[in-house]
Swiss-Prot record:
Organism of this sequence: Pteropus vampyrus
One term of GO molecular function: NADH dehydrogenase (ubiquinone) activity
Domain of life: Eukaryota
Reaction it catalyzes: a ubiquinone + NADH + 5 H(+)(in) = a ubiquinol + NAD(+) + 4 H(+)(out)
The protein's Enzyme Commission number: 7.1.1.2
Role noted for this protein: Core subunit of the mitochondrial membrane respiratory chain NADH dehydrogenase (Complex I) that is believed to belong to the minimal assembly required for catalysis. Complex I functions in the transfer of electrons from NADH to the respiratory chain. The immediate electron acceptor for the enzyme is believed to be ubiquinone.
One GO location term (cellular component): mitochondrial inner membrane
Annotated family: Belongs to the complex I subunit 1 family.
Record-given protein name: NADH-ubiquinone oxidoreductase chain 1
Statement: the UniProt record of this protein carries the keyword Ubl conjugation: no
Cited InterPro entries: NADH_UbQ_OxRdtase_su1/FPO, NADH_UbQ_OxRdtase_su1_CS
Pfam families, per the entry: NADHdh
């Protein structure tokens, strides 16, 4: 039975990934005053299927000087970890209800760094290695602020379980009360998922395509799917953390629809940012984090720790 549950979670995620590629191309197309894909199927709806078919029937080429086992393991690991991170997300019921769901997600996103590092190293190409090293430095750096922001949110929620956040936000969204945290979280998720304007790892003008430059066909498709699954997962997590969806225990389906709509709007916002902003310079990217976000998030975290202790002696003012 558990396998059936697992499949009912994985298949919709992969379908969402397929159609996100189409939405991205359509949104970018309309923002550049053109149509986007509109040939395969009605309004280009079958384009993702055609893309998947094209990628998976291509011969998976492998550079002669590459490290074969690691070269193959990296994309598989990337997709596996991207799908594993969906397990504790409440929709409104998670696949496995963990006590330390947030910690589990942080650990999984840290492990995803290894797949990037291995792919860059195993390709035995200078471009891939430089792209991988950039991606690893960027991902590890921005995880620091993500963890501190999560800690601040959990201090407000009072539990490491994500399901508690539904109850916490019954009266008001955390996005309204903790908007600086929400803002920094959103920008950090952009950097964490290597999206524009932080897509330094795949700077086409410098690194061709970044750490996956030597990949073709199936393995490349796995990396691609992992990246987009991470984008949808991060936006769903943002929706859970900061814009708590309305949850009526008698109608759990309403919560799911609400959550999906919010995650979709956030994802379209990701694409809007991609269409609007130029790429950051690498040193600016690191300065933004270490000199702006980190001091701010640490100060806010200490504020959230100190306030309940400071206010504990004051009687209720109602």
């Amino acid at each position: 039975m558990f396998m059936v549950n697992l499949l009912t979670m994985i298949v919709p995620i992969l379908l969402a990934v397929a159609f996100l590629t189409l939405i991205e191309r359509k949104v970018l197309g309309y923002m550049q005053l053109r149509k986007g894909p509109n040939v395969v199927g009605p309004y280009g709806l079958l384009q993702p299927m055609a893309d998947a078919l094209k990628l998976f029937i291509k011969e998976p080429l492998r550079p002669l000087t590459s490290s074969p086992s690691m070269f193959i393991i990296a994309p598989i690991l990337a997709l596996t970890l991207a799908l594993t991170m969906w397990i504790p997300l409440p929709m409104p019921h998670p696949l496995i209800n963990m006590n330390l769901a947030v910690l589990f997600m942080l650990a999984m996103s840290s492990l995803a760094v290894y797949s990037i590092l291995w792919s860059g190293w195993a390709s035995n190409s200078k471009y891939a290695l430089i792209g991988a090293m950039r991606a690893v430095a960027q991902t590890i750096s921005y995880e620091v602020t993500l963890a501190i922001i999560l800690l601040s949110v959990l201090l407000l929620s009072g539990s490491f379980s994500l399901s508690t956040l539904i109850t916490t936000q019954e009266h008001t969204w955390l996005m309204l009360s903790s908007w600086p945290l929400a803002m920094m979280w959103f920008i950090s998720t952009l950097a964490e998922t290597n999206r524009a304007p932080f897509d330094l790892t795949e700077g086409e003008s410098e690194l061709v395509s970044g750490f996956n430059v030597e990949y073709a066909g199936g393995p490349f498709a796995l990396f691609f799917m992992a990246e987009y699954a991470n984008i949808i997962m991060m936006n769903t997590l943002t929706a859970i953390l900061f814009t708590g969806a309305f949850h009526n225990p008698l109608m759990p389906e309403l919560y799911t629809i609400n959550l999906i709509i919010k995650a979709l709007l956030l994802t379209v916002f990701f694409l809007w940012i991609r269409a609007s902003y130029p790429r950051f310079r690498y040193d600016q990217l690191m300065h933004l984090l270490w000199k702006n976000f980190l001091p701010l998030t640490l100060a806010l975290c200490m504020w959230h720790v100190a306030m309940p202790i400071t206010m504990a002696g004051i009687p209720p003012q109602t």
